[in-house]
A protein has these predicted regions:
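N-terminal alpha/beta PP-like core and its mobile active-site loop of ThDP/TPP-dependent enzymes
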Residues: 13-292
Length: 292
């Protein structure tokens, strides 16, 4: 329903829609095209809305909530994007906990949108009510319980910034069922102009042209040159920053072998003569001895 035109920097169309469609519009703005999910009572309005967005999203339904979160996690790792998944309240949300914990431990960016009982029933031990924000507090970078429609757009935007900045990880957004159904005005400008804290858009302030940094880099190069048996120990940050090729070129240039953490597997071709494999409890005896 076209609700009117609003003047900002330019005229923009304002549309009246329910909270479920607003969430999907926000996901479109984030460039999301794949969603993992499993339907349930609290997220039925979200799935009703998803039907109208079948051309915008590929929805993959798993047979269990734990599977959908692991799938979203795997998708995030393989595509280097944010994985997105839907789960219902109560048992649906608790079933997702193992997958959320895995993504947290492995620094995998993910946004989990869970359904919740209506706001009027919160805290009343309602059917399939669980304090999922409390339950996942120790295994998410941040989590949110959306209390009203005004919080919906900024919460979704902030969730993606938190998940995909600094050390990446999962974020949970818990949305009561009545907010999926509540009508509100929305335009693309709402999302674009939504203000979030500066620290959410983390960017390294490392400047290669800075004299101090150049000095530090030269000192590091000298230390490497003087080393008798240097080893590069590479982790998951290499993959998440798309730096595998740079790592391989660097290792080749200084003729130094590369050891990987568990999350760093795949940083360098295993057939490369400089690839030693992995250290730690899952590594080989030879790999472990290389750092002793």
């Amino acid at each position: 329903i076209l609700n009117g035109l609003v003047w900002g920097k330019e005229w923009c169309i304002v549309v009246r829609m329910n909270g479920a469609k607003v969430i999907l519009e926000c996901l479109k703005k984030e460039g999301i095209d794949t969603i993992f999910g499993y339907p349930g009572g609290a997220v039925i309005p979200l799935y009703d809305a998803l039907y109208d967005y079948s051309d915008d999203f590929k929805h993959i339904r798993t047979s269990h909530e734990q599977g959908l979160v692991h799938a979203a996690d795997g998708y995030a790792r393989s595509t280097n994007t944010v994985g997105v998944c839907f789960t219902t309240s109560g048992p649906g949300a608790t079933n997702a906990i193992t997958g959320i914990a895995t993504a947290f431990m492995d620094s995998s960016p993910m946004v989990v949108i869970s359904g919740q009982v209506p706001t009027s029933l919160l805290g009343k031990d309602s059917f399939q009510e669980i304090d999922i924000t409390g339950a996942t507090l120790s295994m998410t970078k941040h989590n949110y319980l959306v209390r009203n429609t005004k919080e919906l757009v900024p919460t979704i935007k902030e969730a993606f910034r938190v998940a995909n900045s600094g050390r990446k990880g999962p974020v949970l957004v818990d949305v009561p069922k009545d907010l999926f159904l509540a009508e509100m005005d929305f335009s693309g400008e709402d999302y674009d102009l939504c203000q979030i804290d500066d620290y959410m858009d983390y960017k390294s302030d490392f400047d290669l042209d800075d004299e101090t940094n150049i000095k530090l880099l030269n000192e590091a190069i000298d230390i490497i040159k003087e080393s008798k048996k240097p080893v590069i120990y590479a982790g998951g940050g290499v993959k998440s920053s798309d730096s595998e090729e740079i790592l391989e070129k660097f290792a080749t240039k200084i003729d130094t072998p590369v050891l990987n953490t568990l999350m760093g597997l795949g940083n360098i071709d295993r057939k490369n003569e400089l690839s030693l494999g992995m250290v730690g409890m899952h590594g080989s005896r030879e790999d472990r001895k290389s750092v002793v």
